[in-house]
Amino acid sequence: MKYFGTDGIRGIFGETLTDELAFKVGKALGEIVGEGRVIVGKDTRVSGDSLEAAISAGLTSMGVDVLLCGIIPTPAVALLTRITRSFGVVISASHNPPEYNGIKVLKGGYKIPDEMEAEIEERLENGSFPPRLVVGRTKSFREGRDMYIGAVLEIFRDLDLTGEMVSLDLANGATTTTAKEVFEFLGAKVEVFNDSQDGLLINQGCGATHPRFLAEEMKNGKVGFTFDGDGDRVIAVDEERNVVNGDRIIGILAVGLKEEGRLNSDTVVGTVMTNGGLEDFLKEKGIKLLRTKVGDKYVLEKMLESGANLGGERSGHIIILDRSTTGDGLITALELMRVLRRSGRNLSDFAKEIPDYPQITKNVRRTERMSLENENLRKIVEESTSRGYRVVIRPSGTEPVIRITVEGKDREEIEKIVEEISRVLES
């Protein structure tokens, strides 16, 4: 598709993502919605106000009422659309730098399917929108944040964090409006980093894509959680200041849920990027791993297809389907705390049980002449695979790059394979 990637529309504001495009997306979505309502939320980016106004103008011009939540995590908008059975729009570029922004469309708690994205694209390409006699209105819906916090607290009503020291890196993003309040309400003592709503600081050297920041800076926390800009990812830090990635979080949750009888079909969904160490660990515990394409929407599709209720990605996108319909960093963090409290164990003890095979990812800038249908490339992949290395080469769904990932047990050999593939792609 021309506009939609693996996580909605995304680009650098003022270049590939403009107010004009946002206005047209609003009109196209408005045609589909009819005379209903759309809940709109955003992260802290400076361009969020402008895009919010543009997409709202497009929606209201088509007779749709718009409920403005302000700064609020993506999973909060998902929950609100599920409760109200309505459409939602999130203005965010998730983990990307501040100059990026994006548009995600949700319906009834879920990101819309590819077919509906294609329908919006078709309307954008046609560019003709019949006038509506009825014009919609924009209304403040700041109580949406309180509804989300209330729902999360109800889910974890039996979780008592009294005496727990927790450190949070809020990435200067959307969880600045929710995470600290929830942890404190549950009794935890909270140390907070990067809680500014200055839109120029979001994800800058902090958050889920820079977990070492929290590992190096946390002072009092027995456990730490670092979120991304829109709050749908989380990475943990243990009491020894080791980073605990999404794969290991999934492994800990899988064992915890299985012990409670909550892990549907003893199955977990991951992606082609899921570390082989997690797969081996789960197999030892009698748990099956299903793999799918990269992207939390594809993880969710596979979960719904297989009946699994736990799935996610190494990046920290983790879906606990009996808790939430989408990846929710806050819910994942609280579920992990619940498993730890129930077991009486430290996070480091759990995490060390899960192997994490060396894995290197390199981004190569994508050019028009670059092709993955390359005989030399095929030979490298086949030869590497025959020696026990796992190779994944794929276009990014959110950035103009080709991602090369190689996994195995010999880091030096992995580095050689990655560089060899890079040379072939760039030649």
Swiss-Prot record:
Q: How is the cofactor bound?
A: Binds 1 Mg(2+) ion per subunit.
* Gene Ontology MF term list: magnesium ion binding; phosphoglucosamine mutase activity; phosphomannomutase activity
Q: Give the sites modified to Phosphoserine.
A: S94
Q: Which GO terms describe its biological process?
A: carbohydrate metabolic process; peptidoglycan biosynthetic process; UDP-N-acetylglucosamine biosynthetic process
Q: Which UniProt keywords apply?
A: Isomerase, Magnesium, Metal-binding, Phosphoprotein
Q: Name one GO cellular component term.
A: cytosol
Q: NCBIfam families given for it?
A: glmM
- Family note: Belongs to the phosphohexose mutase family.
The name this protein goes by in its record:
Phosphoglucosamine mutase
From what organism does this protein derive?
Thermotoga sp. (strain RQ2)
